[in-house]
Amino acid sequence: MRHILAENFYAASRRYNRAAMNTATSQSPAIASHWPLQALNTFGIAATARAYLRVSSSADLQAVRTDTALSTLPRLVLGGGSNLILSGDFDGLVLHLANQGKRIVSEDDTHIIVSAQAGENWHEFVQWTLEQNLPGLENLSLIPGSVGAAPIQNIGAYGSELKDFFHSLTYFDFSTGEICVLDREACRFAYRDSIFKQDLRDRAVILEVSFALPKHWQPNLSYTELEHELTTSGVVAPTARDISEAVIAIRRRKLPDPSVIGNAGSFFKNPIVSKEVHAVLLEKYPLLVSYVQPDGSVKLAAGWMIDQCGWKGKSLGAAGVHEKQALVIINRGGASGADVLKLAQAIQEDVRQRFDVTLEIEPVLV
C-alpha cells in the first residue's frame, strides 16, 4: 500500500495488491433487477434502478468491471442516500456500499489513527470514536450518510470539516481495476468539494477512510451557536461528549428528521464571495449573516438569503422549504425529482434577483 501525493497523482497511481484483485470471482455478481430506491434515498423520492448490487467488498466491484454486460451500464454509487436527488428511474447499475468495520489502526506521540469501512453509518462511527475516548469528530455528529460519502463532500458543520482530521483513504478505480490510496493533499479538499467530485468523478469507489485523531485535544467552539448551547446548558469546561450532545441537540431542533420528513439536508451551499462584494452587500443589507474565511473571502449564509426572499415554510407542489431552516428543502409527500428541482430553481432565481448571488445546489442530481 502506498500513498498517492497530490503533485504526482496520475504518475503515482498504482495498485497496492494485485494478488488480492486476482482473487475476485470470475462469476457475475448477484444482480437484482428493477430495484426500488425510495427507501434508499433520504428525500424519499420514488424511483427504480434497472440493476442493483449490494457491495460488500472490492471483489464485487472487480466482478462488475470485468462483466461485459455490467461494465457498460451507467453507475450510481450509493451510501446512505442522504445527499441525492433522483430525477426519475435510474437506467443503470446502483452499487450500494454495505462493507462494515471500524478499528484503531496505530498511534504515535500526537495522534491515533482510526479507520472505518465505507458502508459504515457516519454518525455511528463518530459515536464509536467517542466511546473509545478518541475526540476530534464530535462537531460532525448527526450528519446523515455513510463514511464513504463523507470525503466526497468534505462534510462540515459547527466550525469543523472532515479534512481537519482526515488521514487517508482507499478506493477502487473502475478505469484500471486497481485499489489506490490517497492522502489528504491528494484529495484536494475544499468547501464541500474534493477530487471525487472532479477528476475521479464516476471513476472511484471509496472503500475505507482513515482519520488522525489528536491525543492533545482542544474543544472547537468557534461556532457561536454551539458555544451558546453549551453555556445555556451550564457546561463550563466541555468534553468531546458534551460538544457532541450539544451538536445533536441543535441539529434535532433545527433540522427535520429524514425518517419522518424526507429531505437531503442542506440543499444549497453557502456561497463564498470576495470581501469587496461582501462590503457592497453589507451596505445594502446590514443584517446579512456572513463569516469571514481565513483567506479573506466571506461565506454568506444561504439560509438567511432564502428566508429574506420569503421562502421559509413555503411550498411549490409537493416540495417545500422547511419552516425552521430555509436551507432545507423537504418532501411534503409524493414529491418527484422534478418537483424538487422546480422549487430549487425558483429559489435560486429569487436570490439572484435580490442579492446578485448564485446559489449552488449541494446534493448530487441523478
Name each model feature, range by range.
Residues 22-175:
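Anion-binding (especially nucleotide phosphate/pyrophosphate-binding) glycine-rich loop
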Residues 31-33, 38-45, 84, 179-338, ...:
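Phosphate/pyrophosphate- and phosphate-bearing ligand-binding catalytic cores of soluble enzymes
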